[in-house]
Amino acid sequence: MSAQDFLVELGTEELPPKALNTLAEAFLAGIDKGLQAAGLNYESKTVYAAPRRLAVLITALATQQPDRSINLDGPPRQAAFDADGNPTQAALGFAKKCGVELSEIDQSGPKLRYSQNIAGKPTASLLPTIVEDSLNDLPIPKRMRWGARKEEFVRPTQWLVMLLGDQIIDCTILAQKAGRESRGHRFHHPQSVRIGSPSSYLADLRAAYVLADANERREIISKRTEELATRQEGTAIVPPALLDEVTALVEWPVPLVCSFEERFLDVPQEALITTMQDNQKYFCLLDADGKLLPRFITVANIESKDPQQIIAGNEKVVRPRLTDAEFFFKQDKKQKLEAFNDRLQNVVFQEKLGSVYDKAERVSKLAAYIAARIGGNASWAARAGLLSKCDLATEMVGEFPEMQGVAGYYYALNDGEPEDVALALNEQYMPRGAGAELPATLTGAAVAIADKLDTLVGIFGIGMLPTGSKDPYALRRAALGVLRILIEKQLDLDLNDAVAFAVNAFGAKVKAAGLNDAVLEFIFDRLRARYEDEGVGVATYLSVRALKPGSALDFDQRVQAVQAFRKLPEAAALAAVNKRVSNLLSKVEGSVPTEVQAKYFDNANEFSLYSAIQQADQAVQPMAAARQYNESLARLAALREPVDAFFDAVMVNAEDANVRANRYALLARLRGLFLGVADISLLG
């Protein structure tokens, strides 16, 4: 069967840069889906995307759809005809479903069967529908119309190229008749570009100053930006999302170095970087010490004969934005940071939970409580908590919301606050996402935990629990943040007590009944997914969860110990024994004696197990006190032999009540040793 390369390119007005990659990948996926559904084989597929075009190249596409046959089974023959041989409604309905007369149905077998051979169609006749369906299925939140046309797309369409080998596919899609005429660069080559063949697509456009391959443009921008930064004795900040966006804005990238006045460096560099990246799409430069240089890199979409004009234009555009940041910074510093707290009394945190000022006061007290328990400075934590939301009322954060916390840090330093207090104002928002940076200071950790617990308790306390994908107060992220800080920074904090403190701080604003348990359950539930991502089995998590440890650090240490225990050869047998013991003890009527009495032993294996348990108990007590859970479980693994011997030789439910009760007590001691770490009966 013959094969030809296939190219489709849809030309448009400038596409949304942040959506370009998504649109391109969806376009490719849609065409691939259509080709597979039609049974059309090909060798490779590639998507191209630029500001004014989406294109897909399919190599070695079969030019003819293969023939196929269909076989449909109908009702059983006895159900298809009555006693007189007349067709029933079942038979007639099957024929109607197949679109044929009953006489065309095969009636020779046990069931009615309809068979049909379908000749394959030329690929050229199938491609218009495949392309059109793919475009219609693109993830476009809001489509637009243009002119007097009824067609809708993300942007007005301008041209359409569709080639199968040298053949133009005759069709009209989104108001554009297919041909082989594309367009070059809007300024360097505004006239049409003839695409000779699908394989010459990239070369034909390159000659017209268009790099259709987004990966090629991205590589050029990245490499050239790095070279220019090195010449400036700096390092470029190139966030992946910004690089993708800039790549989607240009067809012929030309990075250029621009500069701004050094006086702007007195403004917090985070504000300057934010405005240059978010508003102007510039790559900022840092020196060897991580300080902002008074230079930046812009990526032009034109190879100018006089690049200095482009440089001057960008410098002129950025100056007012930097001037605004400078003005806000100077205005805010005219008063102490704490003075902004008064404004927060009129800013609602949550209608039922009071103002942001109220929240800051609660966070201050809770942060001091937490700091005292994790080895931090309680007075610093209290101060940082009180100032934690002040910068929300500043001009700087009003203009640059991303500066919350960062602005507070600079203003606190300006006011002479201790550095740990200033740092905590920024660290309170950490971690800002999955895998993001954690607070470096204990003061920051205390405020961050306090802020998150206050939000969790408050929102839970008024019944606004997250449901499904809806989590307007980011409670899941808050819970994960608390856990990450405590576990990864090795901070031992009893969350039972901390949550209770937070509940009391709200007073009558929340429904306290059951609130502690609900919040703690929600927090520790987040660990399940965390451990699954780390390859820790659910059973391991549940074995520790059954004990309800209040410390996230302690919880994690137990989980790691159980995970290591499961790799021991004795683990499976001991887990099974624990499950057996748990079942036995759960069926005991009345209470199990707390003391084991040797006088009721009538089997040597009872003495052996009792002795082994006593020795193990003495060994693991100091280990448990030191939270050496790995060592504790490793020592308990040695109980397998006496445990197996006991169950092989001893009937637990003896007829003598005293002997039976004593054996229950012995097994309860055994189970209690393991419960010092986890309920390993759940590992089966």
From Swiss-Prot:
Kindly state one GO CC term assigned in the UniProt record: cytosol
Which one Pfam family would you cite for this protein? DALR_1
Query: Which InterPro entries does the entry mention?
Result: DALR_anticod-bd, Gly-tRNA-synth_bsu, Gly-tRNA-synth_heterodimer
EC number(s) from the headed UniProt entry: 6.1.1.14
Q: Name its GO BP terms in alphabetical order.
A: arginyl-tRNA aminoacylation; glycyl-tRNA aminoacylation
**Primary subcellular site in the record, as a coarse category:** cytoplasm
What's the family? Answer: Belongs to the class-II aminoacyl-tRNA synthetase family.
Q: What is this protein called?
A: Glycine--tRNA ligase beta subunit
Q: Please give the organism.
A: Pseudomonas fluorescens (strain Pf0-1)
Gene of this entry: glyS
